[in-house]
Design a protein with these regions (language model features):
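Substrate-binding and catalytic surfaces of secreted/luminal carbohydrate-active proteins
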Residues: 1-4, 36, 51, 149-154
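Catalytic domains of carbohydrate-active enzymes, especially glycoside hydrolases
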Residues: 33-57
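Substrate-binding cleft of extracellular glycoside hydrolase catalytic domains
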Residues: 60-154
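A conditional alpha-helix N-cap/helix-loop micro-motif detector
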Residues: 28-32, 54, 107
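Conserved residues at the C-terminal ends of beta-strands
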Residues: 16, 52, 131
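Boundary/entry segment of secreted carbohydrate-active catalytic domains
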Residues: 1-37, 41
């Protein structure tokens, strides 16, 4: 990952690229060709992409950017799950102790993958994001702030 002290301001957009019948569960993901088609449309309009996860689909996106010599930089995310209950979440945020323990293990795998991908694409990844709305009071995937800080220091 590029080691700069400041973030630069660019035209940025969140990108997922999922089409009808595709979803982040990993069953059916966008192909290299579909991602390339999307990014060719976005190039010239946007300089930065935000990806919510460091998964197989994100790896395809990074591969397209690198292989096609596209000019995007990426904010790469780690999509983490609840490590504590949140009874204030309107759509449910209470889990068993067993599930929360599994989530902690899952989250560390996600952080490890984030680090690996950022190191694999140092000229593309400009910054990282740990969790998506994981610290707001209404979320169903609440993670304590001290854990987010611990993850960020890895």
């Amino acid at each position: 990952m590029a080691q700069e002290n400041t973030l630069h301001c660019t035209r940025a957009i969140c990108y997922s690229g999922y089409r009808d019948g595709q979803d982040p569960s990993g069953e059916i993901l966008p192909t290299y060709g579909q991602v390339k088609q999307d990014l060719m449309i976005l190039e010239g309009q946007w300089q930065s992409l935000r990806l919510y996860a460091s998964d197989n689909h994100s790896d395809t996106i990074m591969n397209v950017i690198k292989s096609e010599n596209l000019s995007f930089d990426v904010m790469l995310g780690a999509y983490i799950t609840a490590e504590q209950n949140n009874p204030h979440c309107p759509w449910g945020g209470v889990y068993s102790d067993e599930q929360l323990a599994k989530n902690v293990e899952h989250n560390q795998v996600q952080i490890d993958r984030l680090i690996s991908m950022a190191n694999s694409y140092p000229d593309i990844v400009s910054c990282v994001s740990i969790g998506n709305e994981a610290a707001v009071g209404w979320t169903d995937h609440l993670v304590p702030t001290d854990r987010l800080i611990t993850y960020s220091k890895q």
